[in-house]
Curated annotation (Swiss-Prot):
Keywords in alphabetical order: DNA damage, DNA recombination, DNA repair, Metal-binding, Zinc, Zinc-finger
Family from the record: Belongs to the RecR family.
Name of the protein described by the UniProt record: Recombination protein RecR
Domain of life: Bacteria
Purpose of the protein: May play a role in DNA repair. It seems to be involved in an RecBC-independent recombinational process of DNA repair. It may act with RecF and RecO.
Pfam families: RecR_C, RecR_HhH, RecR_ZnF, Toprim_4
GO BP: DNA recombination; DNA repair
Gene Ontology molecular-function annotations: DNA binding; zinc ion binding
Residue stretches making up the Toprim domain: 83-177
Zinc finger (C4-type): 60-75
Length: 200
């Protein structure tokens, strides 16, 4: 139906926008028409910044967060606690934790969860890099800040099994409902979750 109303180029923009998370048919049409009709300079600015970012952004060699440099701002910050490592699913989780101001250690970003049905295993999550980081650094606590979903539980269990027994492993707790995503929690709930973390 879309192709009968819009030209091929407009349809292509709409379909591209639909590939973004949480953007459905109506939203993609609204965004495309706004950018093309009302704000073409914004469209060009977005396109240019995306092209520049995709050409220059890479993953931090330590935590796997997106960065322009080999080492991200948090990993290179000498004021952070090197003995604590918080394992999270995405950079959105990192943003939520940082904005809550509840943690001063380092991170490791999984960029997903173990999900055999989706073809995501330990190698896709770069768990070999995680294992190397834990072995090389003097880490005394690993905090699993992984969403309590079925895939999250599987991932947390797998990671806890691969960590040396002399390292404390804890899991954030109170306030995170089963199936909940960390990035959507408010700061107070995150604070309680971190303070009420339980040892594994």
């Amino acid at each position: 139906m879309t192709s009968k109303i819009f030209s091929p180029k407009i349809s292509a923009v709409i379909e591209s926008l639909r590939k973004l998370p949480t953007i459905g048919k109506k939203s993609s049409q609204r965004l495309a028409l706004y950018l093309l009709d009302k704000s073409p300079e914004t469209a060009r600015a977005i396109a240019n910044s995306l092209l520049d970012a995709t050409a220059n952004i890479k993953k931090c060699v330590y935590c796997q967060a997106l960065t322009e440099d080999d080492v991200c701002n948090i990993c290179s910050n000498t004021n952070r606690d090197d003995t604590k490592l918080c394992i999270i699913e995405s950079m959105l989780d990192m943003i939520a934790i940082e904005e809550a101001g509840i943690y001063r250690g380092k991170y490791f970003v999984l960029n997903g969860r173990i999900s055999p049905l989706d073809g995501v295993g330990p190698s896709e999550l770069k768990l070999d890099i995680l294992q190397r980081i834990i072995a090389d650094r003097k880490i005394d606590e690993v905090i699993l800040a992984i969403s309590p979903t079925v895939e999250g539980e599987t991932t947390a269990h797998f990671i806890s099994q691969m960590i040396a027994k002399d390292i404390k492993i804890s899991r954030i707790g109170f306030g995170v409902p089963f199936g909940g995503e960390l990035e959507y929690l408010d700061q107070q709930t995150l604070l309680h979750a971190f303070n009420a973390r339980t040892n594994i």
